[in-house]
Amino acid sequence: GHVPCGKDGRKCGYHADCCNCCLSGICKPSTSWTGCSTSTFN
């Protein structure tokens, strides 16, 4: 399913769709950041 992410509450199906939500839940601006993933959200 999709989850809200980011300050604007955008919905996304993949981490990379939404400023790369990392495992910590912090959004990063690029997939090149350590810990970011393009895995699907559960």
Swiss-Prot record:
Q: List, in alphabetical order, the Gene Ontology terms for molecular function in this entry.
A: sodium channel regulator activity; toxin activity
SS bonds (residue pairs): 5-19, 12-22, 18-27, 21-36
Q: Where in the cell?
A: Secreted
Keyword set, alphabetical order: Disulfide bond, Ion channel impairing toxin, Neurotoxin, Secreted, Toxin, Voltage-gated sodium channel impairing toxin
Instruction: Give tissue specificity per the record.
Output: Expressed by the venom duct.
Query: One GO CC term of this entry?
Result: extracellular region
The organism's superkingdom is given as Eukaryota
Q: What does this protein do?
A: Iota-conotoxins bind to voltage-gated sodium channels (Nav) and act as agonists by shifting the voltage-dependence of activation to more hyperpolarized levels. Produces general excitatory symptoms.
Of which family is this protein a member?
Answer: Belongs to the conotoxin I1 superfamily.
The record comments on the domains as follows:
The cysteine framework is XI (C-C-CC-CC-C-C).
Give the protein's recorded name: Iota-conotoxin-like R11.15
Origin organism is Conus radiatus
